[in-house]
């Protein structure tokens, strides 16, 4: 879903920066508070960021001006919520843009909005709704939906910037086209990501019982 450097018109690039920045500021404040209250969570924050980096670096080519890959944000969503996930995602996306030529600086706001803000927020809502019903299902849903919704948002971002024709109908048609292209790879990838997230969370709970108490609270 990394929209490449220079692909978005300047007005849309600026819009998504303005959209994303408040979430990053709040995320930074949340990280500061978590570390002050529970210094032992530093390692878990690092693991969550590492998971985002590794999975989002596994890319498959796409003809949309973007690419397909897991997002890795589900773990951070489960452990820390959407605000912290937004900050960690932005840091990963910035690193990838500068050093790996994935995404870009002009499109950092748009990529952060999709992968770091909106996708994780939907995943977090699903986790909150399901965690008292079946915790493993809740983790799976959080990771899977964080991934899928990211690509829905990316499709909308591309459609808004490049509608097939003037008006709402052109935007809808373009969005449907982009989603159809992404779906070929992203539906199976999101399911796999959900399974991997459940396995990793289960392992972390085995070695860090204190985390289980915090997450299930």
Swiss-Prot record:
Record flagged with keyword Transport: yes
Keyword Ion transport: yes
Alphabetized GO MF terms: cobalt ion transmembrane transporter activity
Localisation per UniProt entry: Cell membrane
Gene3D superfamilies given in the database record: 1.10.1760.20
Bilayer disposition of the protein: Multi-pass membrane protein
Superkingdom classification of source: Archaea
Gene Ontology CC entries for this record: ATP-binding cassette (ABC) transporter complex
Alphabetized UniProt keyword annotations: Cell membrane, Cobalamin biosynthesis, Cobalt, Cobalt transport, Ion transport, Membrane, Transmembrane, Transmembrane helix, Transport
Main location: membrane
Classification via InterPro entries: CbiM, CbiM/NikMN
GO biological process: cobalamin biosynthetic process
Pathway(s) annotated for this protein in UniProt: Cofactor biosynthesis; adenosylcobalamin biosynthesis
Regions crossing the membrane: 8-28, 44-64, 74-94, 107-127, 139-161, 181-201
NCBIfam families: cbiM (TIGR00123), PRK08319.1 (NF006184)
Functional description taken from the UniProt entry: Part of the energy-coupling factor (ECF) transporter complex CbiMNOQ involved in cobalt import.
Family, as annotated: Belongs to the CbiM family.
Subunit structure: Forms an energy-coupling factor (ECF) transporter complex composed of an ATP-binding protein (A component, CbiO), a transmembrane protein (T component, CbiQ) and 2 possible substrate-capture proteins (S components, CbiM and CbiN) of unknown stoichimetry.
Protein name: Putative cobalt transport protein CbiM
Organism of origin: Archaeoglobus fulgidus (strain ATCC 49558 / DSM 4304 / JCM 9628 / NBRC 100126 / VC-16)
Taxonomic classification: Archaea, Methanobacteriati, Methanobacteriota, Archaeoglobi, Archaeoglobales
Gene: cbiM
């Amino acid at each position: 879903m990394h929209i490449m450097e220079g692909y978005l018109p300047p007005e849309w690039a600026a819009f998504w920066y303005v959209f994303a920045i408040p979430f990053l500021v709040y995320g930074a404040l949340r990280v500061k508070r978590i570390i002050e209250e529970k210094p032992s969570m530093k390692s878990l924050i690092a693991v969550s960021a590492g998971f985002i980096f590794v999975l989002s670096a596994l890319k498959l080519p796409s003809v949309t001006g973007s690419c397909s890959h897991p997002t890795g944000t589900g773990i951070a969503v489960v452990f820390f919520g959407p605000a912290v996930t937004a900050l960690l995602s932005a840091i990963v996306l910035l690193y990838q843009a500068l050093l790996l030529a994935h995404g870009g600086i002009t499109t950092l706001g748009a990529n952060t909005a999709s992968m770091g803000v909106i996708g994780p927020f939907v995943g977090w809502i699903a986790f909150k709704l399901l965690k008292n019903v079946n915790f493993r299902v809740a983790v799976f849903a959080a990771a899977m939906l964080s991934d899928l919704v990211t690509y829905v948002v990316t499709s909308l971002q591309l459609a808004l910037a490049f509608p097939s024709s003037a008006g709402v109908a052109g935007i809808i048609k373009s969005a449907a086209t982009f989603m159809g292209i992404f779906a070929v790879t992203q539906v199976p990838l999101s399911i796999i990501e959900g399974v991997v997230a459940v396995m990793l969370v289960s392992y972390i709970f085995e070695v860090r019982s204190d985390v289980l108490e915090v997450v299930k609270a």
